[in-house]
C-alpha cells in the first residue's frame, strides 16, 4: 500500500570505480576500464596479492578516515595484470565486508545482490562477486540507477505511478550465479 513503510540498509565504499580510474590516470597501466575484464581473465591465480584502495579512508563497515591505500603480497613476479586483477577483486571484497555485517545486523540472508554503476559492466568482477558472496548478482539494463531512482521517487511522490509499476518495469541485463571451482 502507499502507506507501507520500507527499510533499506546502505553501506558506503568510498573508492570503488575510482580505483579503476586510479589504474588508468595515476598508474597508467590501463588505457580504459573495459580492458580490465580481459586482463583479469588472462591470469589464473593472484598468489595472495591484495589491493586496499583506501585512498580516502575506509567506509563501511570500518569507518576509518585515517586508513590509506596499500598493495600486499608483491613479489618479483608481480606484473601489471596482477595489480589490475587485485584492484578489481578489492571492490568485491569491500562489498562482501558490508554484506556480511548487514546480514549479521538484520538477521536476513542475502539471496540476490542488485548492482549498478560503471563497474558492474565488468563480467569478471560480477562473477567474482557472485562467487565470493555465494549469491546471485543481478545487473540491470540501466546501470546508472541513481538518476533513475530520483525520477522514480518524484513519480511516486506526485502519484504518477505506484511502487508495483516501478518494480514491474525493472529490466535485467544479466544474472550471475555462483560458480565454485573444484
Question: What kind of feature is each model-predicted range?
Answer:
Residues 1-182:
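Glycine/Thr-rich phosphate-binding loops that ligate phosphate moieties of nucleotide
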Amino acid at each position: 500500500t502507499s502507506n507501507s513503510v520500507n527499510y533499506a540498509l546502505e553501506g558506503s565504499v568510498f573508492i570503488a570505480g575510482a580505483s579503476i580510474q586510479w589504474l588508468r590516470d595515476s598508474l597508467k597501466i590501463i588505457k580504459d576500464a573495459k580492458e580490465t575484464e580481459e586482463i583479469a581473465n588472462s591470469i589464473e591465480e593472484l598468489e595472495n596479492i591484495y589491493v586496499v584502495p583506501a585512498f580516502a579512508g575506509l567506509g563501511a563497515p570500518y569507518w576509518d578516515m585515517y586508513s590509506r591505500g596499500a598493495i600486499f603480497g608483491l613479489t618479483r613476479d608481480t606484473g601489471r595484470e596482477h595489480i589490475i586483477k587485485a584492484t578489481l577483486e578489492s571492490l568485491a571484497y569491500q562489498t562482501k565486508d558490508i554484506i556480511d555485517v548487514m546480514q549479521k545486523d538484520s538477521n536476513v540472508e542475502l539471496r540476490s545482490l542488485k548492482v549498478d554503476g560503471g563497474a558492474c559492466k565488468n563480467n569478471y568482477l560480477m562473477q567474482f562477486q557472485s562467487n565470493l558472496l555465494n549469491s546471485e548478482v543481478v545487473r540491470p539494463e540501466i546501470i546508472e540507477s541513481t538518476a533513475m531512482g530520483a525520477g522514480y521517487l518524484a513519480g511516486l511522490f506526485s502519484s504518477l505511478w505506484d511502487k508495483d509499476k516501478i518494480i514491474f518495469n525493472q529490466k535485467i541485463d544479466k544474472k550471475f550465479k555462483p560458480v565454485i571451482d573444484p
